[in-house]
Amino acid sequence: MQVQLETLSNLERRMNIALPMAAIETQVAERLKRVARGAKIQGFRPGKAPLKIVEMNYGAQVREEVMGEQVQQGFYKAVTEQSLRVAGYPRFEPVAAGDDKESFKFAATFEIYPEVKVGELAGKEIEKPNTVVGDAEIEKTIDILRKQRTRYNRVEREAAEGDRVIIDFKGAIDGVAFEGGSSENFPFVLGQGQMLAEFEAGIVGAKEGDIKTVEVNFPEDYHGKDVAGKTAVFEILVKNVAEATLPEVNEEFAKALGISDGDVEKMRGEIRKNVEREVKRRLQARIKENVMQALIDATELELPKALVSLEIGRLVEQARRDMQQRGMNVKDMPFPPELFAAQAERRVKLGLILSEIVEANKLEAKPEQVRAMITEFADSYEQPEDVLAWYYESADRLEGPTSMVLEDNVVEFVLSQANVVAKDLSFDELMGSQA
């Protein structure tokens, strides 16, 4: 086998390979003999057709298979001998042999992995947020849980903020009805911003049975482009006004949250445990994101186009599956690759950087770390032992937790090298507005 390597760019290579035709012909002949043993050809008993007849029927197919295998084997043998790390898949193409009838020549164009030099981390400032969970945060969480179980009771009074109203409405712009401008038996809660402020203001103070005429100015940046910047007149029939009633924090409430004996203090303890677990998870996610961004900012790296393209394909397929699971018809929906390019580039770059840090510093996910992570995850289920056992039934199931532990170890390593700046983060900032 003869090999000639060309450098086309920093990462792109072209390898010209010549394989001995005699070896290929030997492989073809041996393969045809094996095929002949079971070949079913009209006019002959199975396996009894002459080799020439077998070659006439199967020769082209066998030759194509052998050539494909020889090209693959020849290429990967050549890159191994030259210590090249191929990124993505090579592109093969035949090369005219000319007067050389004793060789089969082909070219492989491919990219190699870049040399990764992680930027200086010593002194790199990385923010590490911290959030304290106190009694006030537990009470706030209980209030959120109460609001999620709000009951609405019909009242015979004027509608006020916080009430749920049920209405019929018809809207028109310049006297012409427009798409999405009418509905019947439409429920919403006043003051939650579900409707435009002018629309809601026209209902506040109305009673059941009232008919209100309300003028609404749609903002210029309104999501409905057909009505953005225009003025509509709505005729609104108020069909029901209901007042919100929150459940009391008592035995019944505790039972509704899964506390079988209705012990309120036990309920608070469970809520605290769940909140602390969620706060820990979100803090870890923020710290990890800060570390990853620091690594990206500190490292200049040319990315193999092949890896980015493969990652775009994965992201597109993931987006397609997510939409299908939400009941959307994605059969003819376009997924422009450029929409996923930035995310793909970031993921590829991070993957290369993390691999380099792991290899250079001999980091590993220890079995006890993996077990601790799975145990912590399993504790959020009613039968944690079953969850733990499920993971350890198959090595494949351990791959996800193992990768996560390895990432966590990279984060800890980077933090040990960098200048970590502590920052207090309020509960609301960390969790987002949930009220």
Curated annotation (Swiss-Prot):
Single Gene Ontology BP annotation: cell division
An MF annotation (GO) of this entry: peptidyl-prolyl cis-trans isomerase activity
EC number: 5.2.1.8
Pfam family name, one: FKBP_C
Alphabetically ordered keywords of this record: Cell cycle, Cell division, Chaperone, Cytoplasm, Isomerase, Rotamase
Domain of life: Bacteria
Family annotation (SUPFAM superfamilies): FKBP-like, Triger factor/SurA peptide-binding domain-like, Trigger factor ribosome-binding domain
Main location: cytoplasm
GO cellular component: cytoplasm
Subcellular location: Cytoplasm
Residue ranges of every copy of the PPIase FKBP-type domain listed in the record: 162-247
Reaction catalyzed: [protein]-peptidylproline (omega=180) = [protein]-peptidylproline (omega=0)
Entry's free-text remark on domains: Consists of 3 domains; the N-terminus binds the ribosome, the middle domain has PPIase activity, while the C-terminus has intrinsic chaperone activity on its own.
Assigned protein family: Belongs to the FKBP-type PPIase family. Tig subfamily.
HAMAP family recorded: Trigger_factor_Tig
Summary of the function given for this chain in its UniProt record: Involved in protein export. Acts as a chaperone by maintaining the newly synthesized protein in an open conformation. Functions as a peptidyl-prolyl cis-trans isomerase.
Protein name, entry field: Trigger factor
